[in-house]
């Protein structure tokens, strides 16, 4: 079970998906080669041996980077497992380097650096469903 975040290009003034036109089509993140180079530069510890599916491991968490095989890369899905708020640091570093905003698929809206409520809510839900923390 993972907390899923989508990195997507949105206009700077958009702070909530409710501000977006229904038919809005985001710009791609860029050519696949450039996106992979950005990931490698921002997250040097990421394993990109499978360039469509990278993995970044932290002390108490992991992030799977679903980059896909398309060229150009339209968006990137991050699948986060584990615990610890420090996982948000590489998420927002990568989002910034790619010129993206971070969409919390569980909450259905954008999150900002320091916005941990979605992550904490996911961990509570996960622990309740899996019986952990009892």
Identify the residue ranges that each predicted region occupies:
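Acidic (Asp/Glu-rich) sequence patches and key acidic residues
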Residues: 1-134
């Amino acid at each position: 079970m993972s907390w899923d975040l989508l990195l997507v290009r949105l206009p700077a003034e958009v702070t909530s998906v409710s501000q977006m036109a229904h038919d809005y089509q985001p710009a791609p993140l860029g050519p696949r080669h450039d996106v992979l180079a950005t990931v490698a530069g921002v997250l040097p510890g990421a394993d990109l041996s499978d360039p469509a599916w990278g993995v970044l491991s932290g002390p108490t968490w992991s992030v799977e980077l679903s980059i896909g095989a398309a060229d150009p890369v339209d968006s990137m899905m991050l699948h986060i497992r584990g615990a610890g708020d420090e996982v948000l640091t590489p998420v927002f570093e990568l989002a910034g380097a790619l010129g993206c905003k971070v969409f919390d698929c569980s909450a259905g809206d954008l999150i900002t650096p320091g916005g941990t409520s979605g992550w904490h809510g996911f961990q509570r839900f996960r622990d309740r469903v899996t019986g952990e923390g009892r």
